[in-house]
Each structure stands twice: as structure tokens, then as C-alpha cells.
Amino acid sequence: MGTLGRAIYTVGNWIRGTGQALDRVGSLLQGSHRIEEHLSRHRTLMNVFDKSPLVDKDVFVAPSASVIGDVQIGKGSSIWYGCVLRGDVNNISVGSGTNIQDNTLVHVAKTNISGKVLPTLIGDNVTVGHSAVIHGCTVEDDAFVGMGATLLDGVVVEKHAMVAAGSLVKQNTRIPSGEVWGGNPAKFMRKLTDEEIVYISQSAKNYINLAQIHASENSKSFEQIEVERALRKKYARKDEDYDSMLGITRETPPELILPDNVLPGGKPVAKVPSTQYF
């Protein structure tokens, strides 16, 4: 942006702020009788001067996430709750089908000790776990960055490579394809199995489907939410505790007064094996 562009941008900010200033003055004149309403000015997509995010229409960006400045995000990717992608001093590129999970920070480097100008480049079908930090580095297609991992300037995570959860990857480290690195500082741990490589790709696909569900829920209007709540209430199963709170007494037909393990008709209920979730 040239000098004239910056001047126009600054004047535009002044004009936009005039209404806010008048509102504040009016509130002060009302004294102790004034009513103040503090509104959140959070914006999911925010420009920095003339640099604005370029986001595909099929991308899910959670309402509490922030995508700022020179950021490009490809089709089918998802930016989850609390994430910040800050392309203010350099650019960020996120490929297609990539998921950047909750509370992750992605930033860039304009200057550092080595003097390199480093954008952040994240490829296709990448999974970035919760609360990771990715700064001025490259993550290639089908890679996996574990929860809480930190990748510093100049790091390259090659295709089908994995960074273990909680790891700190030092500057200018290259993690070769098919390897797992972990620790602080991160070092080679072992080779990925074929099953783990398939899992990484499947993880990205799972998040594409999950993002569609969240996008649908977040796009609902207030009226839709109220209608759905009324329907749930209308068709909710009324148990004895619910009825007793309302003072309702229902008669149960004699043919339905059966032990819990017996169905109508005298057939026993098949025993369902328990499932343990990790």
C-alpha cells in the first residue's frame, strides 16, 4: 500500500470512529443515568491495511477463531475454535482438506536472527492438533503435528511425517518423510508404520466431515434454534421424574409392567457387550 493508500485508509478509520466518539460523548452527558452496552468487536476474518484473508467458500472458520491479514485457505479446510492465523507481517497459506484444531497459533516471520523472511506454508490434508504453535515454517501434504507441539522458524515437516504431541522443534530442522520426531528438543524417535500413514490421511477426512456439522450448526438463525428447541421439548421422552415435577400421573398399561430385562411378549433383552473408549 502506497502513501496515498495509507492516508485514505487512516481517514476512513477516523470517519468510522466518529459515530463511536459521538456515542461516548452522549453517554457522558447522561451521567449516572446512562446505560452502557459493551459489544464484542471480534471479527473472524480481518484485514491488515490492504491485505485481507482469501478463504474458499467451503472452509469452516469457527466463530471464535481469528484469520488476519495475508492468509489463504483452500477448499474443505477447517479452522477451529480459538485459533489465530495472523498473516500481518508475511503470508500464510493453508491447503485443501487441512484441519487446524482448537487454540492453535499460526504466525509468520519478517525478521529473525538468520535474517530470513519466512512465510508459513501448510499443505493439503494436514492435521494440526490442539494448542500447537506453528511459526514461519513449512508443513507438507499429509503431515501430522501433535497437540501442543511448537515448530519454530525454518522448520520443514515433510510429507507423511509426524511431530509428536508436546514436542519443540528447533529452528531450521527438517523432519524427513515417514518419521516420527518428538521431545524437547525434538529428535528422531522411529519410523511410521503403514497403518499410521493411513491414519493421518483418514484423520484429515474425518475432520472434513466434522467441520460440515459444525458449520451447519453455527449457520443457524435464532429462529431456527428456537424452533428446534421447541420440537425437542415437544417430543422429549417423559419419564417418571419429569412427570412428578409437573404433578402428572400416568397409568401404565398392565402389559408394559415388565422387568427391565424383558420385552413385551415375554422375550428377554439380549445382553449388549460393554464398549470401552479411550
Curated annotation (Swiss-Prot):
Enzyme class of the recorded protein, top EC level: lyase
Tissue specificity comment: Constitutively expressed in roots and leaves, with higher levels in flowers, particularly in tapetal tissue of anthers, inflorescence (IM) and floral meristems (FM).
Annotated binding of substrate, by residue: 86-88, 101-102, 209
Phenotype of null mutants: Reduced levels of complex I and supercomplex I + III(2) in mitochondrion. Reduced growth rates and respiration of suspension cell culture.
Extent of the transit peptide: 1-43
Keyword vocabulary terms for this entry: Lyase, Membrane, Metal-binding, Mitochondrion, Transit peptide, Zinc
Cofactor: Zn(2+)
GO biological process, alphabetically ordered: anther dehiscence; photorespiration; protein homotrimerization; regulation of reactive oxygen species metabolic process
Membrane topology recorded in Swiss-Prot or TrEMBL: Peripheral membrane protein
Claim: Thylakoid is one of the keywords in the record: no
GO cellular component, one term: respiratory chain complex I
A single MF term (Gene Ontology): metal ion binding
Binding sites annotated in the UniProt record for Zn(2+): 107, 130, 135
Subcellular location per the Swiss-Prot or TrEMBL entry: Mitochondrion membrane
A Pfam family hit: Hexapep
Subcellular location, principal: mitochondrion
InterPro entries, alphabetized: Hexapep, LbH_gamma_CA-like, Transf_Hexapept/Carb_Anhydrase, Trimer_LpxA-like_sf
Function per UniProt: Enzyme involved in the catabolism of H(2)CO(3) but that does not mediates the reversible hydration of carbon dioxide. Mediates complex I assembly in mitochondria and respiration. Binds HCO(3)-. Required for male fertility during anther development and dehiscence to regulate the secondary thickenings of the endothecial cell wall, probably by modulating H(2)O(2)-dependent lignin polymerization.
Subunit structure: Homotrimer. Component of the mitochondrial oxidoreductase respiratory chain complex I; element of the extra matrix-exposed domain, which is attached to the membrane arm of this complex. Interacts with GAMMACAL1 and GAMMACAL2.
Family: Belongs to the gamma-class carbonic anhydrase family.
Protein name: Gamma carbonic anhydrase 2, mitochondrial
Organism: Arabidopsis thaliana
Gene: GAMMACA2
